[in-house]
Each structure stands twice: as structure tokens, then as C-alpha cells.
């Protein structure tokens, strides 16, 4: 999580809407995902008391580890060391069997969409490449498409959604 600026940046705007305009924000989110009026329950962040901004974004799929076997499956699919996914907001929309997971990644401009994979060949890169290969095959994407550069963060979110769909979450 970057330090939050005074009135600028994607995270600042997301927090403003979630904190000061929650009803309208929830309405727009529920409308955007095709569930108008459905209730949304946003998860709280953890605390990081030793940081300049004392909140810690939810990381990876830690908020789902209460599901039997999910942590082991996730660790087999994706590296869980440094550089793991950080979510700007996580919530559940709907009730009961119709409940669906919401994962938010706020972006204030197109430049924020650009990123490269920082994983090393001796670290998590082989697992990431294997996950991308599986997802590309499933989606019918070109095998040679480069998902490790330029829009890596978007690609790793697509891989995460593929994993969650496969696990019926």
C-alpha cells in the first residue's frame, strides 16, 4: 500500500467513497455487477501499527483461508511470498447461495495499470508462468502473449479470478 495523499490517488478516492458515500458507492457497485440493490458486506483491513499508514491491505486470498484445503490449493497455484496480490477492497455481495466475492483494485489513471512481474526465475516466476499458461489455455488466449510485462497486475488478477472460479468461489 502506498502512502495515501491528501485528496489524490486511487486509494484516497476509493476510501472517500466507501467511507463518506457508502450507500451510493454500494448502489453503483451492485448495479455494475448486475445485482441491483443486493446487500454488500465489505471486509475490514488488518492493522499494521509499525507502518506510516497503519492499515494493511488484504493480501492474496488470506480472507478465504477458513475454507478447507483452499490455502494449500492456492499455494500450489500461485507463489505466496513477496509481491503477493494486495486488494484495495474485498467484500461479499448478495445473500446465502447467491453470495459472490467482490475484489476491488482502484486505479486513478491508465498509467497505474502498467506494471511488470518482479518474480525471479529462482523464486516464484516458474509458478506464475505455469499459472498463466493454464489460464491462457482455458481462455483461448494466444500462448505467446506476454502476461509478465506491461499489464502484469491485470494478468495476475485474471489468473486469480480463474482460480476462484475453478474453486467455485
Where are these regions (language model features)?
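Short beta-strand-loop-alpha-helix junction that forms the active-site gateway
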Residues: 106-121
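Acidic, metal/cofactor-coordinating or nucleic-acid-engaging core segments within structured domains
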Residues: 117-169
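Active-site metal-binding core of divalent-cation-utilizing nuclease and nuclease-like domains
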Residues: 56-97
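Hydrophobic, Leu/Ile/Phe/Ala-enriched alpha-helical segments that form helix-helix packing faces
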Residues: 18, 29, 33, 91-93, ...
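Extracellular structured ligand-interaction cores
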Residues: 84-88, 101-103, 149-151
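A structured, charge-rich N-terminal accessory region that forms the first stable segment of a protein
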Residues: 1-65
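Short catalytic/ligand-binding loop motif for oxyanion handling, primarily in non-cytosolic enzymes
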Residues: 98, 110-114, 166
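Conserved catalytic cores of phosphodiester-cleaving nucleases, focusing on short active-site segments
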Residues: 89-91, 100-108, 157
